[in-house]
Structure formats: C-alpha cells, structure tokens
Swiss-Prot record:
Gene: nqrE
The protein's name in its UniProt record: Na(+)-translocating NADH-quinone reductase subunit E
Keyword Transport set for record: yes
Endpoints of the signal sequence: none
Reaction equations catalysed: a ubiquinone + n Na(+)(in) + NADH + H(+) = a ubiquinol + n Na(+)(out) + NAD(+)
UniProt xrefs under InterPro entries: NqrDE/RnfAE, NqrDE/RnfAE_oxidrdctase, NqrE
Self-association state and partner proteins as the record states: Composed of six subunits; NqrA, NqrB, NqrC, NqrD, NqrE and NqrF.
Membrane topology: Multi-pass membrane protein
Compartment(s): Cell inner membrane
Record-listed E.C. numbers: 7.2.1.1
Function: NQR complex catalyzes the reduction of ubiquinone-1 to ubiquinol by two successive reactions, coupled with the transport of Na(+) ions from the cytoplasm to the periplasm. NqrA to NqrE are probably involved in the second step, the conversion of ubisemiquinone to ubiquinol.
GO molecular function: oxidoreductase activity, acting on NAD(P)H, quinone or similar compound as acceptor
Native organism: Proteus mirabilis (strain HI4320)
C-alpha cells in the first residue's frame, strides 16, 4: 500500500505533468483564465488520463509487447499509434457524455475538449507508463495521480490569473507574459517537492 501512496504523491507533486515536465501547456495556458472552466478541463483530463493509462497498459502488455501474442511476435513498433487511438476513443466518449449531460461545460471548453486527444500530458502519461513498465494497478494509480496533478496545476494557475485581473501588471507583461512568469514560479514551487524521498 505504501508503494501506491508513494506513486500517487510522486505523480501529483514531484512529477507533475504540467509543472515538472511542462506537458499539456497549450490547453494549460489557454483555458486557465477562469477557475470554473479550468476545473472542468482538469476533471476531463483526469478522467481521460485515469482511463487511458490503464487501458493502454492492458493493450501494451497483452498485445503489443514482444512475445505477448505469441512467441517471436513483437508489435511494439505500433505503440504510439495504438496509444493515440485508445486516447482518441476515450476523448470521443467523454465529449459525447459532456455534450449530453453537461452542455454548459461542453460549450465553455469549446475546441479544447477535442484537443485533449493530442494533449501531450495524456500521451506523456501513457508513454511514461510503458517506459517505466508499470503493472496494471500501478498504472491506475499513476494515471489518476497524473490527472489530479495536472488539474491541481491548472486550477491554481486559473485562480492566480483571476486575482491578477485586479493587479497593476506592467503593460509589457500583461496577458501571456505574466502568465509565463507565474507558471515558472509555480514550477519552482513544485520543484521543492523533488527533494522529498518516498
């Protein structure tokens, strides 16, 4: 149990997808203007990461890995395209669910919802799972931990950006300039967790 708690904490804080690896930055910067929308996208990314990492783990271990299907067959050259296919299918299902049951969130996310398919944070989580050779239960913990870490980062940035609307920001730094500086400072703050030994 300690191993899974350690893996979860590491995925959320120490190896944060947005602030340690800088993955998923296009949606991270574009959707972080409003906390409510950022939280909705964070939930969507968490769901997709939490489902795609374990599903791709099964596909990788039982279909693509060398000798998985039969002796002498190695389909690992299909890793990337297969991982992207599974992610795309999950995003399409999520998009249909949000359109049907949460239309206001669906409209608020706009074009960024289908872009989760090519969000490099999702693909990065799946790639790290394969590279680090996580088993199925570890991939569940890692997927949800990575999603929660990304959601935490985007909600924190959105709340800071909402407060900065009322701040006296120098004219040359307004908009994305101060957002990049803020993201860098947040990354430095999260880097302090790297000294924690789990």
């Amino acid at each position: 149990m300690e191993h899974y708690i350690s893996l979860f904490v590491r995925a959320v804080f120490i190896e944060n997808m947005a602030l340690a690896f800088f993955l998923g930055m296009c949606t991270f910067l574009a959707v972080s203007k409003n906390v409510k929308t950022a939280f909705g996208l964070g939930i969507a990314v968490t769901v997709v990461l939490g489902l795609s990492v374990p599903l791709n783990n099964l596909v990788y271990n039982y279909v693509l890995r060398a000798n998985a299907l039969m002796e002498g067959v190695d389909l690992s050259f299909l890793n990337f395209i297969t991982f992207i296919g599974v992610i795309a299918a999950l995003v399409q299902i999520l998009e249909m669910i949000l359109d049907r049951y949460f239309p206001s969130l669906y409209n608020a996310l706009g074009i960024f919802l289908p872009l989760i398919t090519v969000n490099c944070a999702i693909f990065g989580g799946v790639s790290f799972m394969a590279q680090r050779d996580y088993n199925f239960s570890e991939s569940i913990v890692y997927g949800f931990g990575s999603g929660i870490g990304w959601m935490l980062a985007i909600v924190l940035l959105a709340s800071i950006r909402e407060k900065m609307k009322y701040a006296d920001v120098p004219s040359g730094m307004k908009g994305l300039g101060v957002t990049f500086v803020t993201t860098g400072l947040m990354a430095l703050g999260f880097m302090s967790f790297s000294g924690v030994q789990l």
